[in-house]
């Protein structure tokens, strides 16, 4: 049996707080789908433009040759959007590094880093856990002397 040639694909993830987005990027026609539906239908609209930032920064011509399928889980609306945009940017950089050329990958990376570092680098901040003796992580219960 003849084996089929391997599809040119990369898989990258983005994280923000508890939200995780995994992007599967392969050669295609420029389609971007988020949880099975086109990215153009994402609600709320204000956050949709945040997702489109990598596309708007780099131009549609760089996304024309690739299809992206994104799975986003966890977190709230905003943190999920930040995870999605990070995974899109990281997937495109990885695809260009692996299947196109190093020069165009470097150009893409420079454009993204100049605009916003969080497009490629994860934010390590996490929620601090609650301790005893108070209602939250740092706040203490009120103390009475009389």
From Swiss-Prot:
The keyword Iron-sulfur belongs to this UniProt entry's keyword annotation: no
Keywords attached to this entry: Ribonucleoprotein, Ribosomal protein
Residues forming coiled coils: none
Keyword Ribosomal protein set for record: yes
InterPro entries per record: Ribosomal_Su5_D2-typ_SF, Ribosomal_uS9, Ribsml_uS5_D2-typ_fold_subgr
Molecular function, one GO term: structural constituent of ribosome
Annotated GO CC locations: cytosolic ribosome; cytosolic small ribosomal subunit; nucleolus
GO biological-process terms attached to the record: translation
Family stated for the protein in its record: Belongs to the universal ribosomal protein uS9 family.
Listed PANTHER family: RIBOSOMAL PROTEIN S16 (PTHR21569:SF16), RIBOSOMAL PROTEIN S9 (PTHR21569)
Protein name as it appears in the record: Small ribosomal subunit protein uS9y
Organism: Arabidopsis thaliana (Mouse-ear cress)
């Amino acid at each position: 049996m003849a084996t089929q040639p391997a599809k040119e694909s990369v898989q990258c993830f983005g994280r923000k707080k508890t939200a995780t987005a995994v992007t599967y990027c392969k050669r295609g026609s420029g389609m971007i789908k988020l949880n099975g539906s086109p990215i153009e239908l994402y609600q709320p609209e204000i956050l949709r433009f945040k997702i489109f930032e990598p596309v708007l920064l780099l131009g549609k011509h760089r996304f024309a040759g690739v299809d992206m399928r994104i799975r986003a889980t966890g977190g709230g609306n905003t943190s999920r959007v930040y995870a999605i945009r990070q995974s899109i940017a990281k997937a495109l950089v990885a695809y260009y590094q692996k299947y196109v050329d190093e020069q165009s990958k470097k150009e893409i990376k420079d454009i993204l880093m100049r605009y916003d570092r969080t497009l490629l680098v994860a934010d390590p901040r996490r929620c601090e856990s609650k301790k005893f003796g108070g209602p939250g992580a740092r706040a203490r219960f009120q103390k009475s002397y009389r």
